[in-house]
Amino acid sequence: MRIHYLLFTFLLVLLSPLAAFSQKINEPVSCIRNGGICQYRCIGLRHKIGTCGSPFKCCK
């Protein structure tokens, strides 16, 4: 029965940092802070990591 407690605490510690990455970027300041740039479309090797407003996307 003790193994269940150890397994639960291990999973809790392992999965808790993932909650921080579930928030979306939806403003230009947070886009720039996360190393992205605001463009109309993501061109080339850049991929969308959020939005900077209605028509613009945050690309990194």
Swiss-Prot record:
GO terms for biological process: defense response to bacterium; defense response to Gram-negative bacterium; defense response to Gram-positive bacterium; innate immune response. Residues 1-22 form the signal peptide. One of its GO terms (cellular component) is extracellular region. The keyword Glycoprotein does not apply. Most highly expressed in testis and heart. It is found in: Secreted. Disulfide bonds join C31-C58, C38-C52, C42-C59. Keywords: Antibiotic, Antimicrobial, Defensin, Disulfide bond, Secreted, Signal. Residues 23-25 form a propeptide. SUPFAM superfamilies: Defensin-like (SSF57392). InterPro entries: Defensin_beta-like. Belongs to the beta-defensin family. A synthetic peptide displays antimicrobial activities against S.aureus, P.aeruginosa, E.coli and B.cepacia. The antimicrobial activity against S.aureus, E.coli and B.cepacia is reduced in raised concentration of NaCl, but its action against P.aeruginosa is independent of NaCl concentration. This is Beta-defensin 8. It comes from Mus musculus (Mouse). The gene is Defb8.
